[in-house]
Amino acid sequence: MHPILFPPTLDNIRKITASLVAAAKASGHRRALVLSGDREWCLQAAQVSLASTSLEPVLWIAAQAPENAWRMEAAKAHRSLGQEVDAIVFDAYSGFDLDAFGIITGAIRGGGLLLLLTPPLAAWPSFNDPEHARIVTAPYEVTEVTGRFLKRLVRILREAEGVIIIEQGKILPSVPFAAPARAETGGNPPSPGDSACRTEDQGRAVEAIVKVVTGQRRRPVVLTSDRGRGKSAALGIAAARLLQRGLKHIIVTGPRLDAVEPVFRHAQRLLPQATVSRAALHLPEAGMEFAPPDDLIRTSRPADLLLVDEAATIPTPLLERLLQGYSRIAFATTIHGYEGTGRGFALRFHRVLDEKTRGWKGLRLETPIRWRSGDPLEHFVFRALLLDATAAPDSAVASARPETVAVERLDRDALVRDEATLSELFGLLVLAHYQTRPYDLRHLLDGPNLSVYVMRYRGHVVATALLAAEGGFVEETARGIWEGRTRPHGHLLPESLAAHLGLAQAPRLHCARIMRIAVHPAVQGQGLGTHLVDTIIRETGGEGLDYLGSSFGATVELLRFWERLDFLPVRLSVKRGATSGAHSAIVLHPLSSSGQALVKRARERFLVHLPHQLADPLRELEPQLAAWLLRRGDPAGPLPLDSQDWSDVLAFAFGRRVYEVCIGPIWKLTWGALAAPESATLLGEVERNALIVKVLQKRSWQEAAAALELSGRAQVIEVLRRTLRPLVLHFGNEAVRREAERLAGG
């Protein structure tokens, strides 16, 4: 690019902006203008730039904006979902919020402009960004948050096509000549099948959703797209068409109400007679409403059609339960971007669809609606935020095994310069974790408390783990955490151990939390994850840490993985996560004698609380999960039953007395037996589950029968009796066994 040799006067800035917007309108693309300098200069230059155009509306994402301007704080950027604007002014002086930036840039339509206001580019990486407060954790200061991400961003800005940079006091850039503008800035012509649709893609999507209702049951459709392709609009248009045809009740679900509001907005546009509230649309004898995924699973609300928007942000187990509960479903999700990580969704959920449905249809929306294909702003945002980060090709890593890989702790100064490794690493995190978002990229690069481990095979990343340093508080702060007076940001393990298990010493010890761990899908099940954690245990053991830990949505598979590495479960949240639908588990592994004592005490306290929690807040916990949490590694010693207790158990087990008058001793035997490893060979799954749902969780006979897929009380009692008999013979003393044999023969 050849510079124009004149100073950056406001008049010249005005001319450059006008030329840039003309080029944008001619191409149907969006453009970006970076104004870099002192804050007051940036604000003045932005106003002058906009005054040279007819762009309207203009949205300011900034802490301050001109009088009467439409302004929105970055934290509220999600409210722009589904809206279209001609221009956005994004003030990086107010904080470069990556999540907001990813959201808000998608609202600019073709022919529009992004104005990015920044500190002087050379100094921006060392700028005290307000976003640092989100990244920093005690005992670090905000000044210790590095500028690696911003350094990378500046490099990408300078390399990007369609981005013009004007720096205060420096020579102005040239701007490509603008060809005459064309009126059309959209994608393909509207589908002839539906006048409300703006592209052929969208028309096909609407037809596919309608077919879900009019065709055979249990044949869902899955819509995928990049942002700006009209996916949510297709859901809304299809919903309106179906309601017009007489469908009675549609439920819309998604990660949050604001994420699905575009669905309601597009339906309302075609149903002007409808009464609309924020979470519902009502017609005289029909309507559609929003419900969170966990509510749908808990309450089993009936619906003629379930629309699941941003499905990638919902954990696969929840999606599977929705699939089981509703016979007519349309799923939609974003492949790239802040709304979800669609590639991981495809990997996880398509297998479920293959197993659970009679046949499902996948449909990809390719054509942009708000701008033309090949948009340079979209390309820049994808690259800057790594929205298109991709794990290594399957073929390149398929032969990786523990003995052929190398594990290293990365130098993040080198990582930020190594785009290939960064993309493969972040691509793995995207595949493995449904909640990965752009903020995580900045945290990964700049968080002073983080360590990044990678496992390589022939130069490619096959696994990665992120560790966060936690704990190490002085006595006064530790006591404040234990008493609930303070909750330091970013110290999940010590805070939970102190606040939930009452372990006052926990915040004083030093630990590391394995925040994320991901193994390439092509080599999962080969022991690479175990090898990675084993390496981390060895490396961190000599660094003054007392214990390692992790927190995750509890499943039997994950608990089994951590148990193989000698990580013990010490906590299970009493409520399910609103978005995950899972209870959060904490597992710990000691590294020092102090850590050993803490882990032992934490496990003891957990087992003190667990039996009472199973009978109260955890009554609906999956019995398979409860059984795993109860397990002990060592064989059971004598159980706390006296001779009268054994007599009561025998009386029920052999049909001499009813359950209700023997319940105490039965509970004692159940609790002790299920904690013993030998119970796995003594009991089948149905028998074990019967003890958990009825004896430990104290569900009603009807609830227990439903959980066990039995007809009622009599069948549950029969299962309990046959379950207790082998336990009596195994755990009882010689006298108890003789009495059991007598009753069995009598």
UniProtKB/Swiss-Prot annotation:
PROSITE patterns: GNAT. Residues 405-617 form the N-acetyltransferase domain. Its EC number is 2.3.1.193. Keywords: Acyltransferase, ATP-binding, Cytoplasm, Nucleotide-binding, RNA-binding, Transferase, tRNA processing, tRNA-binding. Coiled coil: none annotated. It is an enzyme of class 2 (transferase). One of its GO terms (biological process) is tRNA wobble cytosine modification. The keyword Ribosomal protein does not apply. It catalyses: cytidine(34) in elongator tRNA(Met) + acetyl-CoA + ATP + H2O = N(4)-acetylcytidine(34) in elongator tRNA(Met) + ADP + phosphate + CoA + H(+). It comes from the Bacteria. Its main location: cytoplasm. One of its GO terms (cellular component) is cytoplasm. Acetyl-CoA binds at residues 517-519, 524-530, 557, 564. ATP binds at residues 202, 228-237, 370. Catalyzes the formation of N(4)-acetylcytidine (ac(4)C) at the wobble position of tRNA(Met), by using acetyl-CoA as an acetyl donor and ATP (or GTP). PANTHER family: N-ACETYLTRANSFERASE 10, RNA CYTIDINE ACETYLTRANSFERASE. This is tRNA(Met) cytidine acetyltransferase TmcA. It comes from Nitrosococcus halophilus (strain Nc4).
